[in-house]
Every structure is written in C-alpha cells, then in structure tokens.
Amino acid sequence: MNKLIAIASLAATMAVTGAAFSGETPAPEGASVYFINIKDGDTLTNPVTIQFGLKGMGVAPAGTEKEHTGHHHLIINESIEGEELNEPIPADDQHIHFGGGQTEKTLELPAGTHTLQLVLGDWSHIPHNPPVMSEKITVTVK
C-alpha cells in the first residue's frame, strides 16, 4: 500500500511540475498574429520597420498573466517547432522579445534574404496552445 501511495504522489508531483512549463496557456480558437506592413517576397531597405498585428487576443507585457493575452516575438532566420513550442522562447539576435507589449519595431537587417515569423508568447514567453504564429515570410533587404 505504501508503495502505491508513493507512486501516486510521485505521479502527481511530476504532473504539477511539468504543467508549469508545458506550453499549456490556452489560445482562443481563431487567434492569429500577422505582419501588417510587409509580406512574403517584399524587397525592403534599412532601416526596416515591422508592424505586428493580432486578431482574437490582446497584447499584454511579459509577466502579466491575463487570459487570452500575450506579447510578440520576432523570429529572424530561425524556426520554433516541436518541443521548442513547450519552452520559453530564447532571447538572442534571432529571437527578439517585445515583453513591453510593443507592436512595432524598427531595425537594421544585413543586406540579403531573410525569413521572418511572429510568435505570440504567454506571460512567461512560452507559445500558447495551440501556438499563435504567423506564416514564415521571406524578404530581401537591399
């Protein structure tokens, strides 16, 4: 009997611990994020201004745990997929966080071809379930 209680306790602890970073913040059906002012195939010049659109949810700063909200992340020349969707989005030059609730960014991109994608993160920078992600677009910077 003690063995059964120990196993049940361990399973419950694992379930609670795993839920903390499991990417389980729900996104409402039909929620979407998109680029407002650029599209796939565009040729751009520096400085590049990118505007972020969001439908079906609200924008809130990182750390604000409020239902149906999140904040933007701009993914440059990278992908977020598989198990990465259950983890906080990295913060580096390819994964730009807008934890203050920003909906626009002006930046310098090196000349050449780049892929861009928007991913909405929850209060703790983890993508929602299901993930709210734009289509990945390809742009050329002159």
Where are these regions (language model features)?
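Short, compositionally biased P/S/T/A/G/V-rich stretches that sit at domain boundaries
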Residues: 23-45
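Contiguous beta-strand segments within globular domains
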Residues: 42-57
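A glycine-anchored, Pro-Gly-centered beta-turn/N-cap motif
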Residues: 46, 70, 110-112
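Short amphipathic, basic-aromatic surface patches that mediate peripheral association
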Residues: 53-64, 126
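Short coil-to-beta strand junction motifs in C2/discoidin
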Residues: 64-72, 133
